[in-house]
Regions:
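Transmembrane beta-strand segments that form the barrel wall of outer-membrane beta-barrel proteins
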Residues: 53, 76-86, 97-103, 107-119, ...
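Transmembrane beta-strands of outer-membrane beta-barrel proteins
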Residues: 78-80, 109-113, 137-141, 183-187, ...
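Outer-membrane beta-barrel channels and translocator barrels
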Residues: 73-75, 104-106, 133-135, 176-180, ...
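Periplasmic polypeptide-binding modules associated with outer-membrane biogenesis and secretion
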Residues: 1-86, 98, 114-123, 263, ...
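Outer-membrane beta-barrel "beta-signal"
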Residues: 99, 370, 375, 397-411
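Outer membrane beta-barrel transmembrane domains
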Residues: 149-152, 188, 192-209, 218, ...
């Protein structure tokens, strides 16, 4: 029947943010199962700490009253971290401070910003998005700025500098959502500007480039699938990337140029066993229909791809990557201390330039994850390369050792 909606809210969460989502699942005639599923989905919202609801008969025949008690989660968080994850040629040791707020204007809008620094890198990253419908469709803006200088001993005398700016608009729309399954579509437009110089003079290190400048406009269309159960999560993502001649793109008549196509596919899973062991898998593929500008290529090597190698050991148009990791808890609370073992491998090839030699990387190794205190985490990984590469460096990263220390505080 009809229904009335009343709130008992123990926070300043705006009524309309929750009301619009509740109205999406409380259409007449009221279905209690649909309502329960909708409330369970709301519980997954990072803005909500707890939500309780009670459906009671109303004072008028045929009407029901839904009493909702809501406690808002802390929306503001600050994180500081240090690690050695960056490429060695700009300084692998990195410090980062990041800030995020999940409800800036009270509309469920999200803002995040971070600043990172190494010996040769300054990086700024800003992102803002806003929900536009009860299905959590969002529009957003993002801006990235990386200003780097080669600091390796053999090359720092040449004063090689590079600056890349990316300004993008995005639209992300879930089209089907249940507790178990989500389907989402996304559309992004990125405008990317790159500037490079050698000894203070504009210089082209790769194409497309004119007088040390590369301007790209990239349209990206993504499709995402997520399936979750209490002990398993599967996620897949497909992204089509189109380089288009728009917004002052750099136009050259040789390849690679401003017009290109590539596809990026990603599949990930997490499986929790009865003894709280975790098995994680990642499988990525990038296939390019054309030679790609270097800032659109796929890199292998480093903490996020193949451990045991320096970051960006191989950079190619096309790539395949696979990773399996087992996490074994050593404490009663499985999140406090974990030992990890992993095996990873990847291969890459180009559409125009010669393929790298070697073109394939593989690594095995061990790691440790330690929740030292509330918000303070330490991570250590050691990867052993299975394929030899020409590498004379002696940094921790080039020896297959990666570390990070992070502290996060919510307010």
């Amino acid at each position: 029947g009809a229904w009335g909606l009343f709130y008992s809210v123990s926070s300043e969460e705006p009524d309309y943010y929750i009301r619009s989502r509740l109205e999406n699942v409380t259409r007449t005639p009221l279905n209690q199962q649909t309502l329960q599923n909708g409330l369970a989905l709301l519980q997954l919202d990072p803005l909500i700490k707890t939500i309780q609801a009670e459906l009671t008969p109303g004072s008028t025949d045929g009407k029901s009253v839904l009493l909702v008690n809501l406690e808002e989660a802390k929306a503001l968080s600050v994180e500081v971290s240090t690690d050695n994850y960056r490429p060695q040629n700009i300084g692998s040791y990195e410090g980062t401070i990041a800030l995020s707020h999940g409800n800036v204007l009270g509309w469920g809008d999200k803002f995040s910003g971070e600043y990172s620094i190494t010996e040769g890198l300054n990086l700024y990253n800003l992102h803002y998005n806003l929900p536009i419908n009860p299905m959590d469709g969002r529009i957003g803006l993002h801006y990235w700025n990386t200003d780097s200088k080669i600091t390796e001993t053999l090359f720092n005398i040449f004063d090689i500098r590079n600056q890349t700016e990316t300004l993008g608009v995005e639209y992300r729309q879930p089209i089907y959502r249940t507790l178990q399954t989500e389907w989402t579509l996304g559309l992004n437009l990125d405008i990317r500007n790159n500037r490079s110089s050698l000894e203070g003079v504009s210089f082209c290190f790769s194409q497309p480039c004119i007088d040390g400048k590369t301007n790209l406009t990239v349209l990206r269309f993504s499709q995402e699938w997520l399936n979750r159960t209490p002990n398993q999560v599967f996620a897949a993502r497909s992204q089509l990337n189109f380089g288009i001649n728009a917004f002052d793109s750099t136009v050259v008549n040789i390849e690679p140029n401003q017009e290109f196509f590539s596809w990026l596919g990603q599949f990930q899973f997490v499986n929790r066993f009865s003894n709280n062991w975790l098995l994680l898998g990642r499988f990525y593929a990038q296939i390019a229909g054309d030679p790609l500008p270097i800032i659109e290529q796929f890199s292998l090597g480093g903490i996020d791809t193949v451990r045991g190698y320096a970051k960006n050991e191989i950079v190619t148009d096309n790539a395949l990557l696979g990773s399996l990791e087992l996490r074994i808890p050593l404490t009663q609370d499985p999140e406090v201390l974990q030992i990890t073992s992993f095996v990873e491998g990847g291969t890459g090839w180009n559409n125009l330039l010669p393929d790298p030699d070697p073109a394939t990387l593989g690594g095995i190794g061990l790691g440790l994850r330690w929740l030292v205190a509330n918000g303070l985490t330490v991570r250590l990984d050691y990867g052993i390369p299975l394929v030899s590469v020409d590498n004379s460096g002696n940094s921790l990263q080039e020896q297959g050792v990666y570390f990070s220390v992070r502290y996060r505080k919510a307010f």
